[in-house]
Amino acid sequence: LKDGPCPSYMDTCCLSPDRR
């Protein structure tokens, strides 16, 4: 999963941000 703002709200990192 990429880190940072996503271009689309349907992005996986937007739905479930894996920043831990």
From Swiss-Prot:
This is Putative serine protease. Transmembrane segments: none annotated. Keywords: Hydrolase, Immunity, Innate immunity, Protease, Secreted, Serine protease. One of its GO terms (molecular function) is serine-type peptidase activity. Belongs to the peptidase S1 family. Its EC number is 3.4.21.-. It is found in: Secreted. The keyword Protease applies. Binds the A.niger cell wall component alpha-1,3-glucan, a fungal pathogen-associated molecular pattern (PAMP) that activates the host immune response. It comes from Galleria mellonella (Greater wax moth). GO terms for cellular component: extracellular region. It comes from the Eukaryota. The keyword Protease applies. GO terms for biological process: innate immune response; proteolysis.
